[in-house]
């Protein structure tokens, strides 16, 4: 289990991400990169594009 804060958890081998509105969500990748839109994320070693919909290396 990954602890995002005192009340929110994500499954093991995932990453906690926080949306711009303060809502936590789980990225399905270990050490994932959270995108600014608060909905998407990328694998470790990749980054989100400006639209937060594509992952770039």
Curated annotation (Swiss-Prot):
Disulfide bonds: 4-16, 10-26
Entry comment on modification after translation: Granulins are disulfide bridged.
SUPFAM superfamilies: Granulin repeat
InterPro entries: Granulin, Granulin_fam, Granulin_sf
A single GO cellular-component term on record: extracellular space
Keyword Disulfide bond recorded: yes
GO molecular function: cytokine activity
Location within or outside the cell: Secreted
Keywords recorded for this protein, A-Z: Cytokine, Disulfide bond, Secreted
Tissue: Ubiquitous.
Record flagged with keyword Glycosyltransferase: no
Primary role: Granulins have possible cytokine-like activity. They may play a role in inflammation, wound repair, and tissue remodeling.
Family: Belongs to the granulin family.
Designated name of the protein: Granulin-2
UniProt source species: Cyprinus carpio
């Amino acid at each position: 289990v990954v602890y995002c804060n005192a009340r929110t958890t994500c499954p093991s081998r995932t990453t906690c991400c926080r949306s711009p509105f303060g809502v936590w969500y789980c990225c399905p990748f270990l050490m994932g990169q959270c995108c600014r839109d608060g909905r998407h994320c990328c694998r470790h070693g990749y980054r989100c594009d400006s639209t937060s919909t594509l992952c770039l290396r």
